Structure formats: structure tokens, C-alpha cells
Swiss-Prot record:
Name recorded for this polypeptide: Pyruvate kinase
Assembly mode: Homotetramer.
Superkingdom, natural source: Bacteria
Pfam families: PK (PF00224), PK_C (PF02887)
Organism encoding this protein: Clostridium perfringens (strain 13 / Type A)
InterPro entries given in the database record: Pyr_Knase, Pyrv/PenolPyrv_kinase-like_dom, Pyrv_kinase-like_dom_sf, Pyrv_Knase-like_insert_dom_sf, Pyrv_Knase_AS, Pyrv_Knase_brl, Pyrv_Knase_C, Pyrv_Knase_C_sf
Origin organism lineage: Bacteria, Bacillati, Bacillota, Clostridia, Eubacteriales
Keywords: ATP-binding, Glycolysis, Kinase, Magnesium, Metal-binding, Nucleotide-binding, Potassium, Pyruvate, Transferase
Single Gene Ontology MF annotation: ATP binding
Keyword Signal: no
Requisite cofactors: Mg(2+); K(+)
Binding site for ATP: N34, F35, S36, H37, R73, K155
Similarity comment: family membership: Belongs to the pyruvate kinase family.
Length: 474
């Protein structure tokens, strides 16, 4: 059983019924829909198709809606693009929209001229093009082309080390979030989160439109977000290490260190952490990854990531199925060599909260699983809380969450090591233990004579009160 969760971005290469069904069978735990592209009508079709397929495949595949966020972009060019040479003068216009050419273009952030200073850098298209600001003339930013190339319509614009005043949630984002509530998606990925207040703004919109159960994944893509990561983790459900824009906004040599630090902080807080962007990037064009990409996926798992994500590889690449299968194979091999004791040791709190019974029980369960032959930990849960806390401590054996609610199953889709099954509501300890034995055999994780652990909270009518751990022989 694979423990590391996989998120596949759905796009032109993968939005057919055939590919989506194969993704689910390979082990797609969440389907990511990028709302920087497409309209509500096209996304509705995809969501309805995914919902139908996951029902047919009896899968708990979650749907993750990724909002565009306060991204600065270029506007249109004549013929869709223009060629720029090193040393050319080029103007970014913050005034009225103009049609771009090889001397100028408009950008979506109309106040950038107020924020940027001569000597500053502007990067376009994930840093492929670089400009140095010479002067600011009214609403025009006059630059020298440092690294030329082809500049195109609607490409991302980054301004490293310049705090921007764009709102955390744009009007388009608000509309997309409300649409997500209407479509009952499971997760929202909020782009360019810079401070905890940004997360709370997204939360307020979701809560006020029937989306209280939707979990928020905060995408960290700037130095400001990195600087505020501790406070962001406190208010978010999970974090995505979004290395694309991060690697443009922040010196590239810092990105691996930041990735490791964010993963560790999320692990310690028991929050979901996703490693994303360019994990198998060469598989957009080739049927096999580079050795460095295979190492990247493996090392993210060794660091403690809960989930790994494909972007262009699955959305627009030539080999979406091969990329998905390759990612799964690398994950399984990494897990077979994972040092679970190391991950557990670095989570131990030297000053534990004496009231944190659930944490104490979950830590003990993971510790016991590493020393005592245990095939699975079965967690009976109404809210997902018991299973999530067990996942925090990354036991060496699988966690089987049994719950009466499909929505809870999907809320656990991105937590490391959890598989889930819907079952009837439990009224007693005996019922839970009997069901635990049954599902462990059903998933072919345990056989007669094997040991499992059962974790639950009593009385069962109270949610979030994990207070029991029992070893049972099947």
C-alpha cells in the first residue's frame, strides 16, 4: 500500500474519462483543477465527471480547486508574442491597456509603478526573461532587457523583494471560491498566501457560502509567505511548497532549504504538506524522468511530505499516464526505505501538553508499531480527527480510517498513510473492534493471526476525543 498521497493536475492531456479513470486506478488521491485557466462551465463538467468516476471506482478521490490569487500577468501582444534582445529598452505600462510589441506591454497590476524602484528586477515567465528597472516615468516602468527571449500573452510577472499591495483574494478568486462551495469541492489551494490574514479571508468566504467543510491549502510562493510560515500554519489546514514562483521570487539556492523547513514545521504541527512543481518536469516531453527528478520525489518523501503533485506533467504533457505511474513507483520505493523512527523522533515534544490525550495515544501507537509486529492501525472516526493525529506521527504500518461519512473520507485524502472506508455508525467498543478486524482483512493488509491496533474515542457521541488504543489479534 502506498502511503504518500498523489495529486494530479487535470488539463487537456487528462480530462477525458479514460485518462481520469486510469488516474484513479493508479492511485490519484486528489484531482487538482487550476482556475487560472478555463471557465466555470468547463470546470463543472470536469468536477461532475470526477465525481461520477470516483463513485464507480469506489474511491475517495478528493477535488482540489486551485484559485489564481494575486498573480501579476502581462496583457496581450500583437500576434500573441514579441522577441526581446539583451540590452533592449522595454517598458511595462501600468496605465491604460495597450497592445504589446517588442518595446512595451501592459501588466495587470496597475500600482506596480508606485512600489518598484530603479535598480529593481522584473522577471517574466517563471524567470525566463529578466529586466532591470532604469527609471519610473509616470505610470511607465522603463527597463533594460537583461535576459531576452520570447515574451507572450498572459505570462506571470514577478518582482522579487518588492512587497505588493494586491489583495489576497481578487474578485475572480471570490467568484471561484463561491463556485467551489456550490460544487462541494473538498480542498481549496489559495495562491500567494503572504500572511495569516490571507488564509482567514479565504476561510470567511468559504464559511459564508456553505463551505465550512472545505479544507484550505496555503501555497507559499514568496519571501513574505516564508517569513510568516509559523503563523500561517496555525490557521491553515495544509501548506503547499509551490516551488515555481518561489524559485523566481527567492534565490534558487534557498528553495531546497525552505522546502525542508516548511515540511518539518508542518509535520510538527500535524498539518498537511504538499511538495509541488517540476517534480517530473521532463516527462512533459519524455516518457522517462531524469535521475535528478527521481531523487527529488524520493527526497521529498524522506523529508516527511504528505503528498506530491504533478502539474504540467499530467495536465498538458505528452505522457500523463507514464508520469503518474512513475511517481507512484518512486514513492513506493522511497517508503520501503523510509526511516520512520527518525521522522517520529523529530516530532517528540519535550514539553507535551498534559491535556493532549489524542497526541499521546497517537505517538504511543506509532512507537509501538515500530517495535511490535503490527499490520495496521484502525481508527474509528466521525470527524477525521483521530486518523489525522495518527498520520502526524507517521507510523510504519498503514492507518485505516473507518467513518460513517464519505465527506470525512475525502477530507483525509491528503494525509500520509491513511486509507479509508465508509461504515455504519458505532455504538460500542465491541462494534468498532469487530469492524476493525473485518476491514484489515478486506484491504488484504492483515490475515488471521496478525496483530492490529484500534484507536477510537469514547463515548462515541463526542467528536475529537481520541482516548483509547487497543492491540487486537485477528
Amino acid at each position: 500500500m502506498q502511503k504518500t498521497k498523489m495529486i494530479f493536475t487535470i488539463g487537456p492531456s487528462s480530462d477525458s474519462e479514460e485518462i481520469l479513470r486510469e488516474f484513479i486506478r493508479i492511485g490519484m488521491n486528489a484531482a487538482r483543477l487550476n482556475f487560472s485557466h478555463g471557465d466555470h462551465a468547463s470546470h463543472k463538467e470536469k468536477i461532475e465527471l470526477i465525481k461520477r468516476l470516483r463513485k464507480e471506482e469506489k474511491s475517495a478521490t478528493a477535488i482540489l480547486l486551485d484559485i489564481k490569487g494575486p498573480k501579476i500577468r502581462t496583457y496581450n501582444f500583437k500576434n500573441g508574442e514579441a522577441e526581446l534582445k539583451n540590452g533592449d529598452e522595454f517598458t511595462f505600462s501600468c496605465g491604460d491597456e495597450i497592445l504589446g510589441d517588442n518595446t512595451k506591454c501592459s501588466i495587470s497590476y496597475k500600482e506596480l509603478y508606485e512600489d518598484i524602484k530603479p535598480g529593481g528586477s522584473i522577471l517574466v515567465d517563471d524567470g525566463l526573461l529578466e529586466f532591470k528597472v532604469k527609471e519610473v516615468r509616470g505610470t511607465d516602468i522603463i527597463c533594460e532587457v537583461i535576459e531576452g527571449g520570447t515574451i507572450k500573452d498572459h505570462k506571470g510577472v514577478n518582482v522579487p523583494n518588492v512587497p505588493i499591495k494586491l489583495p489576497a483574494v481578487t474578485e475572480k478568486d471570490r467568484s471561484d471560491l463561491i463556485f467551489g462551495c456550490e460544487m462541494e469541492v473538498d480542498f481549496v489551494a489559495a495562491s500567494f498566501i503572504r500572511k495569516p490574514e490571507d488564509v482567514l479571508e479565504v476561510r470567511e468566504i468559504l464559511d459564508s457560502h456553505g463551505g465550512k467543510d472545505i479544507k484550505i491549502i496555503s501555497k507559499i510562493e514568496s519571501q513574505e509567505g516564508v517569513d510568516n510560515i509559523k503563523e500561517i500554519i496555525k490557521v491553515t489546514d495544509g501548506v503547499m511548497v509551490a516551488r515555481g514562483d518561489m524559485g523566481v521570487e527567492i534565490p534558487i539556492e534557498n528553495v531546497p532549504i525552505i522546502q525542508k523547513n516548511i515540511i518539518k514545521k508542518c509535520n510538527q504541527a500535524g498539518k498537511i504538506v504538499i511538495t509541488a512543481t517540476q517534480m517530473l518536469d521532463s516527462m512533459i516531453r519524455n516518457p522517462r524522468p531524469t535521475r535528478a527528478e527521481a531523487s527529488d520525489v524520493c527526497n521529498a518523501i524522506f523529508d516527511g511530505t504528505d503528498a506530491i503533485m504533478l502539474s504540467g506533467e499530467s495536465a498538458s504533457g505528452s505522457f500523463p499516464i507514464e508520469a503518474a505511474m512513475t511517481m507512484s513507483r518512486i514513492a513506493k520505493k522511497a517508503e520501503a526505505n523510509l526511516d520512520y523512527n527518525y521522522l517520529l523522533r523529530r516530532l517528540k515534544d519535550p514539553n507535551p501538553n498534559p491535556d493532549a490525550f489524542a497526541d499521546a495515544i497517537s505517538y504511543s501507537a506509532s512507537k509501538t508499531a515500530s517495535k511490535f509486529p503490527t499490520k495496521a492501525i484502525v481508527a474509528a472516526t466521525q470527524t477525521g480527527s483521530t486518523a489525522k493525529i495518527l498520520s502526524k506521527y507517521k507510523p510504519s504500518c498503514p492507518i485505516i480510517a473507518i467513518t460513517p461519512y464519505e465527506k470525512v473520507r475525502r477530507s483525509l485524502a491528503l494525509n500520509f498513510g491513511i486509507i479509508s472506508k465508509k461504515c455504519a455508525y458505532f455504538n460500542s467498543t465491541d462494534e468498532i473492534i469487530e469492524e476493525a478486524r473485518k476491514v484489515a482483512k478486506e484491504f488484504e493488509i492483515a490475515e488471521t493471526g496478525d496483530n492490529i491496533m484500534v484507536a477510537a474515542g469514547f463515548p462515541t457521541s463526542i467528536t475529537g476525543g481520541t482516548n483509547m488504543l487497543k492491540i487486537e489479534k485477528i
